[in-house]
UniProtKB/Swiss-Prot annotation:
Binds 1 zinc ion per subunit. Pfam families: Ribosomal_S14. GO terms for cellular component: cytosolic small ribosomal subunit. This is Small ribosomal subunit protein uS14. Zn(2+) binds at C21, C24, C39, C42.
Amino acid sequence: MAKADYNKRKPRKFGKGARRCIRCGQYGPIIRIHGLMLCRHCFREVAPKLGFRKYE
């Protein structure tokens, strides 16, 4: 096998690397509820615009 063959990877089907944030592209903590697909950092920024409210 050539070295170039090692760089070709099949797309991930499950796990953290399978989903990206649609806003910033981060792979880590994704919020998928209601089909949001946002990382938690982006979700905290846009949550008020989406209609989410913080209750005490």
